[in-house]
Design a protein with these regions (language model features):
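Short, charge/polar-rich alpha-helical segments
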Residues: 16-19
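Duplex nucleic acid-engaging cores and interfaces of nucleic-acid transaction enzymes
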Residues: 12, 22, 26-212
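Feature marking long nucleic-acid-engaging regions of large polymerase/nuclease enzymes
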Residues: 1-8
Length: 212
């Protein structure tokens, strides 16, 4: 009714309705994640504040990620082999410590760590999972990806003709690409005509990690 919504047109009303639905979903997800973390006995004031400040569903997923029950991973296998202290040592980035030399202390036939290289690989697996589970890093990487990454696509088979031919050699900044192009590339990939990737300059990604 016009008296209820004034001069707003149908598109504006749909946007308001969509936003309201999203905010309701956001609050519901916050409550669900808070409950799950509480039940696991892992809730802290920092986690609670992070949930309260979260403005997107992806942020909530990032916050919950470290608490989500994990299947067997390379990092969990490395931890079972006693390599967490080695990972912690590497993270300290002490220039006086030689990681290769330090890794020799973790060799164990019983735990099936047979070489320094294997010990270092396990420690790196632990570090990789730690970084991947860090909500603040994931959020910052997402922002940098939106600002600086390229969406690229190429043909799975360059000789094969298809309606996706214009995307056989395609590259465009993520922040500039139109929605219909993203959908077309997604369809082309699902149908097997395209291979798509999001490319981010390695130096920008590393800068985020080192400035955390």
């Amino acid at each position: 009714r016009k008296e209820a919504h004034g001069s707003l047109d149908d598109q504006a009303l749909r946007q308001i309705a969509d936003r309201l639905e999203y905010l309701r979903s956001l609050e519901k997800k916050k409550e669900e994640v808070a409950r799950l973390i509480e039940e696991s006995g892992s809730m802290t004031s920092e986690v609670s504040q992070a949930l309260e400040k979260a403005e997107t569903l992806s942020e909530i997923d990032d916050i919950y990620r470290p608490f989500r029950p994990k299947r067997k991973t390379r990092a969990s296998v490395a931890k079972a082999k006693g390599l967490q202290p080695l990972a912690d040592c590497i993270l300290e980035q002490n220039p006086q410590i030689n990681p290769e030399q330090e890794a020799l202390a973790y060799l164990s036939e019983e735990l099936e760590v047979t070489s320094a290289e294997e010990a270092l690989q396990g420690a790196n697996d632990i570090i990789a999972e730690l970084i991947s589970d860090d909500a603040s890093i994931r959020k910052r990487l997402r922002v940098v990806t939106m600002e600086h990454a390229l969406l690229t696509s190429k043909a799975s088979n360059p000789e094969e003709d298809s309606v996706y031919a214009q995307y056989y050699e395609f590259s465009q900044p993520v922040k500039q690409i139109a929605g219909h192009r993203v959908l077309a590339i997604d369809r082309g990939e699902r149908e097997g005509f395209l291979k798509a990737a999001v490319d981010l300059d390695k130096e920008k990604g590393l800068h985020i990690l080192y400035s955390t």
